[in-house]
């Protein structure tokens, strides 16, 4: 049964300015494993990665119906690449199936997260 669907978007230019300021925002938003992947990237790909992970976490919290804050925090949600480069999302706050989707162009990063409860 579908528990929730969350959608979010982030402007690439906004995220580029954040990345240019240093790693403070990235360290707050990304889990240690995500940050490790992030540090391996450069330029545009680094901006897309941070913006994508931020947006996916926003989408997840919207699908949960809580938003980010008291119940769900950035460190409770992790999205890593599988062997084929697909995003695989896990969370300490949800035990069902999580289906993340991410797309981006030169201007916008858009994410969708579908949560499926297991019976």
From Swiss-Prot:
Known catalytic reactions: apo-[ACP] + CoA = holo-[ACP] + adenosine 3',5'-bisphosphate + H(+)
Cellular localization per UniProt: Cytoplasm
Hydrolase keyword on record: no
Keywords, in A-Z order: Cytoplasm, Fatty acid biosynthesis, Fatty acid metabolism, Lipid biosynthesis, Lipid metabolism, Magnesium, Metal-binding, Transferase
GO biological process, any: fatty acid biosynthetic process
Keyword set includes Transferase: yes
Function statement: Transfers the 4'-phosphopantetheine moiety from coenzyme A to a Ser of acyl-carrier-protein.
Binding site for Mg(2+): 8, 58
Leader sequence segment: none
Similarity-based family: Belongs to the P-Pant transferase superfamily. AcpS family.
GO CC terms: cytoplasm
Organism whose genome encodes this protein: Lactobacillus johnsonii (strain CNCM I-12250 / La1 / NCC 533)
Top EC class for this record: transferase
Top-level taxon of origin: Bacteria
EC number(s) on file: 2.7.8.7
Listed cofactors: Mg(2+)
Name of a matching Pfam family: ACPS
InterPro entries: 4-PPantetheinyl_Trfase_dom (IPR008278), 4-PPantetheinyl_Trfase_dom_sf (IPR037143), ACPS (IPR002582), Ppantetheine-prot_Trfase_dom (IPR004568)
Name of this protein: Holo-[acyl-carrier-protein] synthase
A single MF term (Gene Ontology): holo-[acyl-carrier-protein] synthase activity
């Amino acid at each position: 049964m579908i528990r929730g669907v969350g959608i979010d978007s982030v402007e690439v230019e906004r995220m580029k300015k954040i990345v240019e300021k240093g790693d403070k925002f990235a360290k707050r938003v990304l889990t240690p494993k995500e940050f490790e992947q992030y540090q391996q990237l450069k330029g545009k790909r680094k901006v897309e990665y941070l913006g994508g992970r931020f947006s996916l976490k926003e989408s997840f919290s919207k699908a949960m119906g809580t938003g980010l804050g008291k119940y769900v925090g950035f460190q409770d949600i992790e999205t890593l690449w599988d062997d084929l480069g697909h995003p695989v999302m896990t969370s300490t706050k949800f035990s069902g199936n999580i289906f993340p989707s991410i797309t981006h162009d030169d201007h916008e990063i858009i994410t969708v997260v579908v949560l499926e409860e297991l019976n």
